[in-house]
C-alpha cells in the first residue's frame, strides 16, 4: 500500500502506508488485481484482510464503500493506492530501435496519447468521468517528480504526455484558445465576413470565465488530494 485516502473504507479499517495485503478471507493475494476484484465485487460487504505490517501478520475488517458507475452498476471502493515495486534487472527487457523505427514508434505513441486525451475530454463532458478527477499544476508537479525519480526516459514520457494534453486542449473551440480562433475563421469562411467585434468580445469574456472556473476547480481538486 502506497497511500490510504483519508476517510475511505481502508482508513476506517486501519490500513496504513507500507502494509502488504496477503489474504482476503481465505484467498491469497499474489497480484494486486485479485484484491481490487474482491473489493469491486463486494460493495458494502465486510471483508476480512490478513495484512503483513513490518513482518507481523495482523487481521483487519474492511467494508468497501459503494460507488455507482455511469451504467448504474454498483461497485466497491477501498481507497488505497498501490506501491509500484521496480522489477529486478533479470526481468527487464530492453528493446532498441533504429532512427526510422524510433520515429514511427514515437508517432504511434503520440497518436495513442491524442486519442486517449480526446476520449477523456469526451467522458468528462458526458459525465462518465467525474469532474473531481481533473488535475492542476500541483498534481502535474507531483507527477513530474515521481517520473523523474523513475528515470530520464519516464520523465521525458511524462513531458510528452503533458505536451500532447495541452495541445489537444488548446484546440477545443473555446474563445481565448487557438481552437476558438479557428472556429471564428471557420465561421468567417462560411458567412463571407468576419464575426462582429461585439460577438467576439462577448465570446472571449465567456471563454475566459470558463477557463478560470476550470483552473479553480483543478486547483481545488489538487488541494483536496494533498
From Swiss-Prot:
Key words, A-Z: Cell inner membrane, Cell membrane, Hydrolase, Membrane, Metalloprotease, Protease, Transmembrane, Transmembrane helix, Zinc
Q: How does it sit in the membrane?
A: Multi-pass membrane protein
Query: What sections of the protein cross the membrane?
Result: 152-174, 202-221
Highest classification ranks of the organism: Bacteria, Pseudomonadati, Pseudomonadota, Gammaproteobacteria, Enterobacterales
Q: Note the subunit structure.
A: Interacts with RseA.
Q: Where is the PDZ domain?
A: 1-56
Where is the protein found, in the record's own terms? Cell inner membrane
Q: Which GO terms describe its biological process?
A: proteolysis
Give the species this sequence originates from: Photorhabdus luminescens (Xenorhabdus luminescens)
- Cofactors named for this entry: Zn(2+)
Quote the protein name from its UniProt record. Protease RseP
The family this protein is said to belong to? Belongs to the peptidase M50B family.
What is recorded about the protein's domains? The 2 circularly premutated PDZ domains act to negatively regulate protease action on intact RseA.
Q: Name one GO cellular component term.
A: plasma membrane
Q: What does this protein do?
A: A site-2 regulated intramembrane protease (S2P) that cleaves the peptide bond between 'Ala-108' and 'Cys-109' in the transmembrane region of RseA. Part of a regulated intramembrane proteolysis (RIP) cascade. Acts on DegS-cleaved RseA to release the cytoplasmic domain of RseA. This provides the cell with sigma-E (RpoE) activity through the proteolysis of RseA.
Q: What is its main location?
A: membrane
